[in-house]
Amino acid sequence: MSVVPVVDVLQGRMPADSEITVQGWVRTRRDSKAGISFLAVYDGSCFDPLQAVINNTLPNYQNDILRLTSGCSVSVTGRVVESLGGGQRYEIQAQAIEVLGWVDDPDTYPMAAKRHSVEYLREVAHLRPRTNLIGAVARVRHTLAQAIHRFMDEQGFFWVSTPLITASDTEGAGEMFRVSTLDLENLPRTPDGKVNYDEDFFGKEAFLTVSGQLNGESYACALSKIYTFGPTFRAENSNTSRHLAEFWMAEPEVAFATLDDAAGLAEAMLKYVFQAVLTERADDMQFFAERIDKEAINRLKQFISADFAQVDYTKAVEILQNCGQTFENPVSWGIDLSSEHERYLAEKHFKAPVVVKNYPKDIKAFYMRMNDDGKTVAAMDVLAPGIGEIIGGSQREERLDRLDQRLAEMGLNKDDYWWYRDLRRYGTVPHSGFGLGFERLIVYVTGMQNIRDVIPFPRSPRNANF
């Protein structure tokens, strides 16, 4: 007899009266005076549990069934029947139940069947996927990731696995985690007293990557359309609801593409993945709309149907300066727009997703293409109502002399980027790309308030538990 997932039963894929086995964990148990017990059994395959109806004639009813509590794992064999009660179309009439695992002490079980705060759940991150909330987040996260891969594949992109250990600082910001096997109690020193990294594992300084972009450009300049999708790391000491030290990024890179091409790709990708999650995770999205953010579903539908607005950074600054609203962070040309500025543009002024383009060069990375005005670079941010920036990208600087100029301006040693510069020496082409912070995308989709609740085991300052 085959083991079937709960979702197949609840969605009617198993014929009525068929004999099946489901395996999962007990969410709740209730007993009637008529000698019948009802178990809510979930296996994570969908939001809702399956109800198992158990008669007291089962041989282990007294010794096992009446001892079951939330969190126990069970294997239930029985017949699929149409449910007479409300709440579900189908249930299972149990013919045999095997208890696979007991909860040691139900009184101290951290995941007792009640609503827990997200702050508490972070303290028990190894058990929190058993809750409705984090289970729904996990399924939505999976669907969004699969939709990104599917979209890229359909658009002819190749997935490239870029290294997590690097010697390059993509952003030039210096907020990187160092990778070393040196003995911290007995560091080797050079004659002038500095740490001698020649004796380290890689023979030089090495770090965890902040982005796969530079390596991705290498493959885009050979395969034309590639993307990376994996973890990135920032040693930024920010203990906020918007920051993680370890997070995932999706980073497409396209040869022979302009900034406008990248903006068009970003719009198409976001609409594709939002439609996928609405279609494939309707039950979980309904939960988020009911319990977390009543606009969760409507927000995605409006995003999908909206035409993206486009505005130059200079014009955006004018709009903000003349809007009559007082901002916590004053607006002037040359600043990096803050979240309040971004949200005003998307929510109040344009009332739609916005692509802000052509930022001042001094607030952007060295690899962004210099515009003809000598003051701005071909950079873009996609701003979404409700969250602000959701994607950042640019046309890359394909001219070697301009790239060297930017490296010098930012105090970066061009010899450290010798291989990146080679791409400009051997058949250089215009190319563009962007980065999508995956956890920020999940926050936007679900309405969750803290980014630490949309990644399985969050890493943040003073926190690397589990």
Swiss-Prot record:
Xref: Gene3D superfamilies: Bira Bifunctional Protein, Domain 2, Nucleic acid-binding proteins
Alphabetic keyword roster: Aminoacyl-tRNA synthetase, ATP-binding, Cytoplasm, Ligase, Nucleotide-binding, Protein biosynthesis
Cited CDD domains: AsxRS_core, EcAsnRS_like_N
Major location (coarse): cytoplasm
Enzyme class, spelled out: ligase
InterPro entries: Aa-tRNA-synt_II (IPR004364), aa-tRNA-synth_II (IPR006195), aa-tRNA-synth_II/BPL/LPL (IPR045864), Asn-tRNA-ligase (IPR004522), Asp/Asn-tRNA-synth_IIb (IPR002312), NA-bd_OB-fold (IPR012340), NA-bd_OB_tRNA (IPR004365)
Single GO MF descriptor: nucleic acid binding
Keyword Cytoplasm: yes
Keyword Membrane: no
EC number: 6.1.1.22
Pfam families found in the cross-reference section: tRNA-synt_2 (PF00152), tRNA_anti-codon (PF01336)
Gene Ontology biological process: asparaginyl-tRNA aminoacylation
Domain of life where this protein originates: Bacteria
Family: Belongs to the class-II aminoacyl-tRNA synthetase family.
Assembly and oligomerization: Homodimer.
Protein name, UniProt field: Asparagine--tRNA ligase
Annotated source species: Sodalis glossinidius (strain morsitans)
